[in-house]
Curated annotation (Swiss-Prot):
GO molecular function: structural constituent of ribosome
Protein name: Large ribosomal subunit protein bL19c
Keywords: Chloroplast, Plastid, Ribonucleoprotein, Ribosomal protein
SUPFAM superfamilies: Translation proteins SH3-like domain (SSF50104)
Main subcellular location of this protein, as a coarse class: plastid
Source organism, top-level taxon: Eukaryota
One cellular-component annotation, GO: mitochondrial large ribosomal subunit
Gene: rpl19
Location in or out of the cell: Plastid, Chloroplast
Length: 123
């Protein structure tokens, strides 16, 4: 049974490889990123910019790699989950990095104003 599952996982990886984007920069939890998202409105498509802090990241080297981004939209905090290898994402740009000590930053949901800021790392 185990031999079949390893063959199946190898087959799945070989199928996924052509669809994985290679030009995505290294993104860590705590980074402030900006990404372009293609949005279809009726018959038109436009690029929508989304900028925010990465709260969580799942499956680092897979086709299903996703990240949770917390943006502020008209003064209200909004969390969105993006699949990095989605064809709707046009670009990803790291704006600033932060020093963190947690794997997931879900505690930022409850903090407002200055309390919700992260300590910036200067390279």
């Amino acid at each position: 049974m185990k031999a079949n599952s390893t063959k199946l996982s190898q087959l799945m990886k070989s199928v996924e490889i052509p669809f994985i984007k290679t030009e995505v920069p290294e993104i860590k939890v705590g980074d402030t990123i900006q990404l372009g998202l293609m949005v279809k409105e009726g018959s038109k498509t436009r690029e929508q910019l989304c900028e925010g802090v990465v709260l969580a990241r799942r499956r680092k080297k897979s086709l299903n790699t996703s990240l949770t981004l917390r943006c502020s939209f008209q003064g209200i905090g909004v969390e969105r989950v993006f699949f990095l290898n989605s064809p709707r994402i046009t670009f990803v740009k790291v704006i600033r990095r932060a020093k963190i000590r947690r794997a997931k930053l879900y505690y930022l949901r409850d903090l407002l104003g200055k309390a919700g800021r992260l300590k910036q790392i200067f390279n």
